[in-house]
Amino acid sequence: MHEQRRGIVRVDRFLELHRRLLVGVLVAILGGLGLSAGCLLVMTRLRARASAEVTRIAREWDVLRKPDNTVSASGHEVEGRGGSSIRAKEDALLARLESCASSPWRDGFAYAYAQACVADIFFARKEWEKAQQAYVRAAYGARRSYVAGVYYFNAASCADERGRFEEARELYQRSARVQDFPLVPRALFNVGRMEEALGRAAAATAAYMQLYERFPLNGWAALGKSRAIAISVGGGRAQ
């Protein structure tokens, strides 16, 4: 009991001697929390504003890319697909998207969606390399979502169009590793297809059979198995 009293006295004396210091520390902590909350609020508003802007741009792009469209999102007449007026409007949309994607953070809906819209525009133009790069950036921004699988898959398609089969194979593999991505069998089939394009028959056969073992009831797996059989019948060559 005596020791407890001594302890209480020591604490009281410490608080009395260092009261100003403790008050200063408390004020600093509260001020820091207030500043953090303020910064968080500002960032949240900026993200919401960027998301709304990207959504508006995406709607304008949807109107602009319609094959039978003769009127732009702003109501002005435009030339046919590929015309200078259409391209100029696409360039304007790209500039706005780049502004939305140039924020200090590199994740979240606004960044990923902006990069995906950039990729879609370049994909429509068949500018495969630029589209591929933008899809990869979109996948990074959406890395916590299954949507990343979609973006990696699209990036792989761009690499495939460019004849960059090794890049395409790697990107298809990335898409297949994304959790909850619904097109995993199709992505894995394309891994085998890229191995075939690279002339690696054994690797292609292995990829197709692994696909079949993982998803035996899937249509892509059945097609993969038939490709593996065709390679085997062809003596290690694609048929």
Swiss-Prot record:
InterPro entries: TPR-like_helical_dom_sf (IPR011990). PROSITE patterns: TPR_REGION (PS50293). It is found in: Cell membrane. Gene3D superfamilies: Tetratricopeptide repeat domain. It is a single-pass membrane protein. Keywords: Cell membrane, Membrane, Repeat, TPR repeat, Transmembrane, Transmembrane helix. Disulfide bonds: none annotated. TPR repeats lie at residues 112-145, 149-182. It comes from the Bacteria. GO terms for cellular component: plasma membrane. The chain crosses the membrane at residues 21-43. This is TPR repeat-containing protein TP_0282. It comes from Treponema pallidum (strain Nichols).
